[in-house]
Amino acid sequence: MSVQIIPFQQQLPFLGSHLQSMRIVFRRDHPDVSALNPAPIQVPMNDGSGDVMTGIIHTPAEQRFPGLLLVAGHGFGGSAQSAYTRWVTKFFYDLGFAICRLNLRGAGNSRPLCRNNYHGACGDDLIRLWAWLLTAKPPAVPFRVERTYFMGASLSGSILANALAKIDNTNICAPSDLKGVIGGLGICFPFDMAAAVRKIHSVTNWPYLKYFLSKIKPLFAA
């Protein structure tokens, strides 16, 4: 599987990292996608933990590419309800793509179903998700998934990179179960996790650190 790096291009008026990070605060324009033919799914991790990831698959009446399922992942502290996850869902659904809004392990409504939490190196969770999607049958899924493509924003992009690095040598499932994984897209994700930690602890980023801590504390209190 080849890798292509596409340079990030800023768009007015959101220039610089701070304005880009705060865009969803300034502009509450994320769409309501709850009525877009939703079908909830539950994905058992099958790793002895009993954990279950959850998601919502939105299937257009006329699929542009039958059998193809896009999957949208969220960042740290997010869920299937995150603004950018909903933007991506609405955009591709309107183009005729079936798309799944995913709750990573312990996120969103998967919290009471999980003992563990997602992190940047949990690529095995995506491999389990792919294997499940590509072998599941209705009514567990709304249609037979033959191909899947993952789009990961922020931390879920890191998880995607971790998964793709392992996919050729995994012992989680048979290689044939993963033939339908056609690729993935990581968007603005931390590749060097140590550098990302140092950056978020810098003086100018303390509001973000405070926000992230407020998101992570309930996970460990649960």
Could you say what each language-model-derived stretch is?
Residues I41, V71, C100, Y149-M151, ...:
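Hydrophobic/aromatic beta-strand patches that form the interior of the parallel beta-sheet core
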Residues R86, K90, I127, A161-A165:
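Short, hydrophobic alpha-helix immediately C-terminal to the catalytic nucleophile
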Residues A83-R101:
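Short amphipathic alpha-helix adjacent to the substrate-entry channel of hydrolases
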Residues F76, A98, N103-A107, P190:
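Short beta-to-alpha linker loops that shape the active-site pocket of alpha/beta-hydrolase fold enzymes
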Residues P139-A140, R144-A222:
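Alpha/beta-hydrolase-fold enzymes
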Residues F14-E62:
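N-terminal cap/lid segment of alpha/beta-hydrolase-fold proteins
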Residues T89-F91, R105-Y149:
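Catalytic nucleophile-loop/oxyanion-hole region of alpha/beta-hydrolase
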Residues P66-G75:
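Short beta-strand element of the alpha/beta-hydrolase
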